[in-house]
Amino acid sequence: MSGRCARKGLRFILDAAQTAGLIDIDMTKLRLSALCFSGHKSLYGPQGTGGICLGQGFRPEPLAVGGSGSESFSPTHPTVMPDALEAGTQNAHGIAGLLAGVEYIKNLGGKAFSVAAGHAKRFIKEMKGVEGVTLYGDVDAALRTPVVALNVRGRDSGDIAALLWDDYGIAVRAGAHCAPLMHKTLGTEKIGAVRFSFSHFNTDEEVDAAIAAVKELAK
């Protein structure tokens, strides 16, 4: 993809909202112009945080200007980075929280991903043999995030999520997951999907409980 973009003179911008903090990304190797990430997912920062990492030679124009605080007496917005892209008062406490999350992930190394991926792999293995359970995506991919989307006997995903919480104390996400076009492609635009997101914070016992709960609901 990066090679094609380079040949056409296009910028290659990677959306790492779901992968930042989970999967190693080499911006230089991928020849990325920019990488965009959310802070509140696998980087464990506060909600409302995120950022853009710029590659060499890429300088986007700011979408908003004014109130930088660094050059208050200047009638124009600063041009030095990162001030050029940071208009108004910055979310200092959010940035501090994001920094703490990034440091936590760095200290863990690859442990967080390997544990979470192991949980997801075991969950998928058990779900494959359950009649009435439909799994979505390439569940056999060698490298995938520890997120599993499924449906149970064609029932509304919100109903299944409510039962999982009320009867089993298991928290999942139901609905379209901000991807309505994907659900249209899957044919699930009316019922959505139930999303299990595994983490290194989860225990083997919790994974076992999730497996048992889905099996029971699928009967």
Label each region the model flagged:
Residues 1-219:
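Pyridoxal 5′-phosphate
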